[in-house]
């Protein structure tokens, strides 16, 4: 178990290993300039059978690169027998998920506490 924090003024993330769940809190803007960093950080902590919970309550913007990273993490997690849940998706980013139809491939719950693995 452990927590790591990285970020700058426009983007930040906390990753906490909670046993069978990797909790990833994203702050700010998940865009092309930082999306590869998130992918690398999550992949470094992802093991077979581990679930991933994204707390997106403080994410204010996402672009196609950010969406692509989330989809890659979803694919890798499923390959390992785990599950990905997105929680607390805010209205602005939710529009991007809905327009691109990416919301159809993720389980999205209103709050972090609603996630069931």
Predicted regions located by residue number:
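Short acidic-hydrophobic, aromatic-tinged amphipathic segments that line or gate anion-handling sites
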Residues: 107-111
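Short alpha-helical segment
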Residues: 114-115
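Amphipathic alpha-helical interaction surfaces in cytosolic regulatory modules
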Residues: 30-106
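STAS-typified acidic loop motif
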Residues: 4-40
């Amino acid at each position: 178990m452990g927590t790591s924090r990285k970020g700058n003024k426009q983007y930040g993330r906390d990753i906490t290993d909670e046993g069978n769940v990797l909790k990833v809190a994203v702050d700010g803007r998940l865009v092309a300039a930082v999306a590869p960093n998130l992918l690398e950080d999550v992949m470094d902590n992802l093991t077979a059978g581990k679930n991933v919970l994204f707390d997106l309550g403080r994410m204010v913007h996402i672009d196609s690169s950010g969406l692509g990273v989330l989809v890659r993490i979803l694919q890798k997690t499923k390959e390992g027998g785990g599950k990905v849940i997105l929680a607390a998706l805010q209205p602005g980013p939710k529009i991007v998920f809905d327009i691109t139809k990416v919301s159809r491939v993720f389980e999205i719950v209103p709050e972090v506490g609603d996630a069931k693995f």
